[in-house]
Each structure stands twice: as C-alpha cells, then as structure tokens.
C-alpha cells in the first residue's frame, strides 16, 4: 500500500513514490556518541545480545579492530562496523543462548573471547540497599575487583567483575594493561540510583593492573585507583592490581582463644614496629620469621604495626593512606601479609594494626574528589580539610563513607586475622575546632563536638566487638573526652583501650630532669595515678616520641652513659608496673642513641655495647616477670588492683606502691628516681614474711652496679606507711625493685 500523496508532488507534476518503513539503525547515533565519550550510563542496553524482530542483534565495542565476528555453534557471523569502534549485526537466532566474539586486529592475533556485556550485575538489590543505608559490613565482597569463573554452554568463562561507587560521575570505564590503558573497551553501567557502577570483563585475571577512568561532574576526566583495591602496584606507581587469595590459614586455635579472652584482664606488652626500617630489605614472609623470633625471645605479647595499608609516600610512615583495602606492596602480596600474621599467631604473638580513618591525602588519582565532587571528604572546607597535615577529612555523616570505613575495619580483621586496631588521631575527629583557630563551624547544638564522627566511632566499636569478641580497639586520643573506653550503651565511645598521653608526657618530662631537680616536680610522676582508672589505658612510648628533635629515651636521660642506662631501665620498670598495658617502639628496648628514621634500619650494632645489651636483657626479664605475675595485669582497670605505699617522699625521689592480682597475688614496686643510693629504705608491707625480689633493674646482668637484696627481703614487726609490717630495701640510684609477697 502506498502512502498518502504529498500536495507538493502534484504541484511539480511528479508521481509520488511508494513510502516504505525506514528501518531503525542497529545502533542509535546518540548511543554511539555516549559510548565514544565514555559517558553512557547503561552501555549494557546497547552492547551485548538483544532481541530483534529478525532474531538477535549483537553489538560489540572493539576499537582498532579490523574485523569482528560472532561465533555461534562453530559458525562465524560477521559484524558490520557502525562507527566509533562499534560493530553490529542481526543474527538469525531468536534465542541466542551463548556465543563468542572473534576479533581480528591489523597485523595482530585473532582474539576469541566471551562477551562481558551479556552478564548480569554482580550486585543484587539487597547489596545496593545496604550500601545506601551504610550497613553493608562486608562491602569488600561486592565492590572492588573480583576474579570470577562462570559456566556457560560454550565452556567456562573466566574474568573479573569491577564495581565502584561514584554517584555523581557522568561515566566510568575500567582501564588497564588489558586494553593498553585506552579506556574504550570496558564502560561500566550505573546500577539504578545507587551510585554504583559495574562491569564484568572476560579474560582479565589476577595480576592485571587497572584504574577507573571517571568522567566527573566537574567536567574533568581523571584516572583513579580503586578505593577498594585489594592489591596495588609498588609505589610510586599508583595502579590497582586484580588479586585473589588461595591462602590456607593455620591459626584456628589462636582465633578460638581470642574469642574467649578479655584483653583488659590479660597481659599485654606491645612492641611497636615500622616494618620498612626494622630490618630493611625484608619481605613479609622474612619479616614474619625474624620478627617472631625477636619478639618471642623478648617476651612481648603483641606487635603493633605502623600503617600497612598502601600509601604512596614512605615519609608519611603510612599515615597518608590511598588504598585502605590493600596491604602495601613494598613487602609482598596480600597473601604474603596473611602468612606474616599467621606465622606470628603460630608463635603466640598478637598483631595490632595502626588504622587511619581520620583523614586521607589529596592525591587526585586516589580518593580526592572521586567523582568530580567532594565524595569521601566533607564538602565544607571547615570540616573537610585538615590544614595541619594538608589532607582531607572523611565525611563521617555520609552513609556510604561511614560504611566504607566500618567495613574496612572488619576487612582487616576477617581477611588478615588482625587482633586489634589502634585508631589514629581520634582527637582530630572528635572536635570541629581541632587545630582550626577561629575558622570552624559549630554543630547543630552550637557545640564543638563532631557529632557525626562520634556516631561513626560508636558504630565502629559496636560492629567490631559484636562480630569479633576479643579483638581490641585502641584510641590515640590526647584530650579529656569522657568515656572513650566506656560502652556505647552508657554514652561512651566503646573503645577497648586508650593511649595515656598524659602519663607519657609527664613521665618523660620528669625523668628528663636532673635527679637533683626532680623533687621540685614530684607531682609529675604521681599525677597519672589520680586518673589511672578513668579509662582503660595503654602506656605508650611510641614512634612519635623519638623523632623531630625530641631525642630518644637514651638521650633524654641526664648524666653519663651509666646513668642514662640506669634511667632507661628504671623508666621501663615503672612503665611495666604502672596500671595499664604498655607499648614500646622498636629501638627503645635497647636504648638506641639516634632518633628513629624511616629511611634507615635500627642501630643493631649498639647491642655490642654492654649498657645497651643490658637494657635489652632487662626488657626481656620485665616481660617474663610481667606475664607470669597476674598482679601486674589482671586488675589494670580497677582501683582495687592498686594501693599506694609511699607517694610523697619527694625529698628522696622514692615511690612505692602495691599491685594486687585477681588470683590473690601481691607485688610491691619500689622506685628510686634520685641519683643517690638508699641502702636501707624502709617500706611498709601488708603481709609478714619473706618477699621475693623478682626484679631489680640495677642487676649486673643489666649493666647495673649490682646493688640488691640477695633475692629476698624479710619483714619486721615495725608498722610503717600505715602497714602492719615493714622491711628495708636496698635501692640503687635510678633503679626499681619488685617484690612478690609470700603466698599462704
């Protein structure tokens, strides 16, 4: 049937031609343009196989190809080039179940591959809902790069699924060495309004380097590393790396014991380590063997690692993280790090990790302005920038950002069996005016508390403690914020423990003084006992105290080398006896002279010096006695585990106190912080009999003068210090003596 006549045709005396229905093109020009620009929000509606009145239309994106065919049941069907690297044709197969794409490149090989645009999304509706609500605690199971293997009619298909959150992006494409970093073969689809983009790329497997080419809302195109990359290139290279894991863990018994352990009522002596400078040149597996041997011989219960999440700048010590889900490639693969943790667990050593959720660097290839807008960072510079460090601050009030961080905590615990997280820079998170002068914005109540950060920290601790009893969370928090280690159900932040920065500052300041002046500052050494049970504390002498001109424990001590060594030993004995767990940075356990530098190893040669070797021996014995003596750790968090004997003898610079164990044990700890010998210092004691000298830091084995009590002191019926009996104790200058009470 002909169409209606056009009056214009009659005017010109022309006979109208029959009108035919014009067939639609195999690809709409708008789709071609969007695919070419990398800004198509749903390329899967164009590419792949789709129903057609004459069968099935197959569209393939193969820029630079000379010929493209579709192989169905062993028969190749050629596709036509329709422009912009897209090839298409209608195949006479109404129900096309499976096929392969055959691509010929000029002067190159013929490549046969499955079509990634035929596969369904790897995230379900529940996943997307939980991400939007900020409640997907296993976020790493669905975002990031995951090697997969599918069974199809034409055989198995291996590849990698990629998924990334970028809600304001105009388009996202996976680029990598699989496509020569061209960025025009793997456009991703936006999954509804979730902000998640996803694609499956066949024949891409472990070891493939990749990034996301993000067309931002600001009009810029930036190649970003994957926020959930599980492995990375070796810095300074910045690509993410596809990886899987086939590691078989051997620490089931360790994890079972951990679940039933209360860390606050258990011994905890922590050796803080920077892996790159402990013994330079070692990988994770070599470090595991050598570090485990060292730590076990020294008697520590745990190691705490400066951040191992990937960071491009070594001089940041790991505190400017760009890949929160990837152990640094400097020392090996993720499975190598798993082996590191597993080996330490096998040696009876827990592994704590320094974790940095407060801020992240501005590198544009990482998290910064990820989709062309402030995405992970708070949009208001008064809240979103940390001026002191030149970094961005996470937007803790945004569901997806909070989810990213909370899930990351579970990731390290579940994927790498980490025993605890030391949370860095908590004070900077809690206060809106932290280091901001007058340029800060109050909260909705007009206060300076960051309510979103408080909610995040509470959620973090609730999630970790619910999912993994026995795992510790430790706050580096330097203010008097109340209830840092109290339960969230009573308004606290929910941390297991908190660093006692006040103890560290006061103690190091006191002992840096010449002994002749210490009596005028006696309150500095006693003040920490006023608030010792207000929180569950860790006493830290960390990396921060041995850098930037602060000196070391050795150089802080007054006097000649003999006096310095005595001062270090006395300090450590005081630290181990004080209520709270203890953390000591590497090198300080043998009194290293030089400040720490991440660019060089420790000065192990100093152990050839008897004084430095003596400090190391003293630390070994401190740990041995500490672990064997419940009085020193079982009641750290209750005043019932402590009592003063002598707090006020400022003239002779002597302190003495009792520690009580939940098993009924009692230890008296006596300290002489003067430069004089107190040959017969009388100490009041609660129990009559022979008290065993279980530690004396002036022992000759430690490099001391050998002043001691011959292993035992005997009480006399002389009331003293409000106690029914007493004994005289020989106290060398700058020394500590621990005495164990007789047991009934």
UniProtKB/Swiss-Prot annotation:
What is the recorded name of this protein?
A: 1,4-alpha-glucan branching enzyme GlgB
Q: Which reaction does it catalyse?
A: Transfers a segment of a (1->4)-alpha-D-glucan chain to a primary hydroxy group in a similar glucan chain
In which residue ranges is the amino acid composition biased (Basic and acidic residues)? 7-23
Q: Which stretches does the entry tag as region Disordered?
A: 1-23
Q: Which HAMAP family would you find in this protein's record? A: GlgB
Recorded GO CC terms: cytosol
Recorded source organism is Nocardia farcinica (strain IFM 10152)
Share what the entry says about its subunit structure, partners included.
Monomer.
Keyword Nucleotide-binding tagged: no
Q: Which GO terms describe its molecular function?
A: 1,4-alpha-glucan branching enzyme activity; cation binding; hydrolase activity, hydrolyzing O-glycosyl compounds
Q: Which gene encodes it?
A: glgB
**UniProt keyword list:** Carbohydrate metabolism, Glycogen biosynthesis, Glycogen metabolism, Glycosyltransferase, Transferase
Its annotated pathway reads: Glycan biosynthesis; glycogen biosynthesis
SUPFAM superfamilies reported for this sequence: (Trans)glycosidases, E set domains, Glycosyl hydrolase domain
